[in-house]
Amino acid sequence: MKFTDGQWMLQPGVAAHYAAEAYEVQAHEDRLVVLATTRPIKHRGDTLQGPTLTVTLTSPLPGVIRVAVEHYAASSPPRLHIPMVGAGRPAVQVAETETHVSLTSGPLSVDVKKGEGWSLVFREGERVLTKSDWRSLGYIQWGAKGNHVHEQLTLSVGENVYGLGERFTPWVKNGQVVENTNKDGGTACEQGYKSVPFYLTNRGYGVLVDEAGPVSFEVGSEKVARVQFSREGESLDYCVIAGPTPKDVLRRLTALTGRAPLPPAWSFGLWMTTSFTTKYDEATATHFIDEMARRELPLSVFHFDCFWMREFQWCDFEWDHRGFPDPEAMLARLHAKGLKISLWINPYVAQKSPLFAEVVKQGYFIRRDNGLTYQTDLWQPGMAIVDFTNPAAKAWYQGHLRRLLATGADCFKTDFGERIPSEGVVYHDGSDPVEMHNLYALQYNEAVFELLQEVQGRDAIVFARSSYASGQRFPVHWGGDCWSTFESMAESLRGGLSLTTCGFAFWSHDIGGFEGRPPPAVYKRWIQFGLMSSHSRLHGSSSYRVPWLVDEESCEVLRTFTRLKHQLMPYLYAKAHEATQTGVPLMRAMLLEHPDDPACATLDRQYQLGESLLVAPVFTESGEVDVYLPGSEGSGAWTHLLTGEKKAGGRWSREQHGFLGMPLYVAPGSVIAWGAETERPDYDYARGTVLRVFELADGASAPFTIVGAEGEVAARGTVTRTGRRYIAEVGEGALRDWALDVDGRRSPPLAQGGTLAWEDV
């Protein structure tokens, strides 16, 4: 939201009161409390009338400083905040001089200037990260538009801003206005299903605005050298998070807001769905599954979308027996084929649902402020919305899902959760509906994930569309409704990179696009992109996404890249496990891996899976693609995973690829654990493993880790090169029937033992 009109003027009707001086600073053992006046205090008369702001500086985690700004303390209802499961009270250091007071937490400090001339300076060591200074912190009065608190933090020359949730606009957010409100808008607009009021910069710090309700970000779009964030109300809280690297920022962010548990290994395989409004029944599903098997197309999960239930009745949690006469027997047959089953749900109950009257009577829906049930025709006619702030409503909802799990479902696609009313409604626990709008997605997904963990244990997984800050605790998430075009494929990737830059470890998208019918080139290129993502799902709206309906070559592309992903699973699953321990996502923007390479600061058409594998999807019908390989002179060559071609880093190249190829490069000095299985993602990663060594320098060592399908470390060790001699040593766990591979030359396998020495001749 813009409050100014250019550099000097205010918007008509705006009265702005900016922090002008730190009139008083109270230093406590664990905090600083600053009385910020909005005018310089020259004499006693200046202390009368006009607002003051109380600014409290604390630390919830080493390397994180929280700034809580408050105008009126007692005239607003209790506020909701982002769940911070890791918040504590770490030891801080408070120091005071004649002119400044500072608070230090870990490597991060904030200096408060005493007296006239408002200034908060955030430093990591001696390096200034960002500042709140002249006309940065303000209290705004705007008549019918309400009162607002805003902060503006400075941007340095060349500083880029990233994140702010799943945003499909350009990955670098400078110049954009971002409204932190979940909306069901699709990927072709500025709205987002998963708002996260957090941004990361290439200067090595992040900012998390700790607000549940709407926050408006002006990213260099009101004051070009500042990020402004504001909310309506009498207060504003935010946290500055230290690096120094982007990965360090994400480690601290997720230590504060929570990390994802490890998804089951089977979930990394190929998912296929019925699509949305297509005509389908048991025969359709069975035909698709059998045809996949006949064509030797590996499949791990089959998903039944909305119409597994009867039309007009979502959700009643009952199979439509016209198309699925004996669902329990059907699911047993599908399980016997080695498949997992996913069912579509949403948090609404339509008026025609047999459950509707019961739920109204029990009071389990969100109500209007007159006490009646809130209903709408937007989506299901007459639908009402489950109130998850009511423990009984949550238990009722979980009870229906528990029954579905008992009869053969394995997981749920938790769709919707964005179109939640913000005005004129009442929640069971009295929560402010404005602040609940975004948090609703968290409560919905938490209710489902909590039940899945109880019943399925480590196999718990959702396929969620809506979320909010800290929602990474309930994986997996997908990018929502996209078009079947190259442009939409690219915007989907931008959304994924923005989301994973906010600490979400796992992300997916609809292979082939959701809306429309994908041309063959789009479909095949999206298959490549989809299988080189953390989770991979074929899904559409009004047309099926099975490959043989596109063309025969699509089957070959799908087979090739599904099998490739399966063989990469020992590497990918170790990186997935790493994400659960560190908060660094599996799918990483180039900036995360190469923060010191200026070329990586703006790249949003390629990414890395872990630190070793670079992926550049092809977004052209011709197969032409530009790819940048980071590095500098002497840093070693990147190796194409499929062809073995080597290229020096630190330069761009323009490549041409057929549909069975794409830019997949392995970083120099890497060891990729290569699996023995091509037909399924969940297998013993420590048996038949080949440690593929790429451009390991003479005298250097490279680590490897293999995590078992149950989440345990199966093997950990290093590969060392001395001249032409390579020695792999397993220091923890064990490998069986394993080998080394250097540039396609493979050692004899070692049945057992922790050391494999081989000379590459």
Please give the residue ranges for each predicted region:
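Catalytic core of carbohydrate-active enzymes
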Residues: 449-461, 467-478, 491-495, 499-509, ...
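N-terminal accessory segment at the very beginning of proteins
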Residues: 1-259, 265-267, 273-275, 280-290, ...
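Aromatic- and carboxylate-enriched substrate-binding clefts and catalytic-loop regions
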Residues: 70-72, 298-558, 593-595, 603
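Short, well-ordered loop/turn elements at secondary-structure boundaries
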Residues: 97-99, 104-106, 115, 192-195, ...
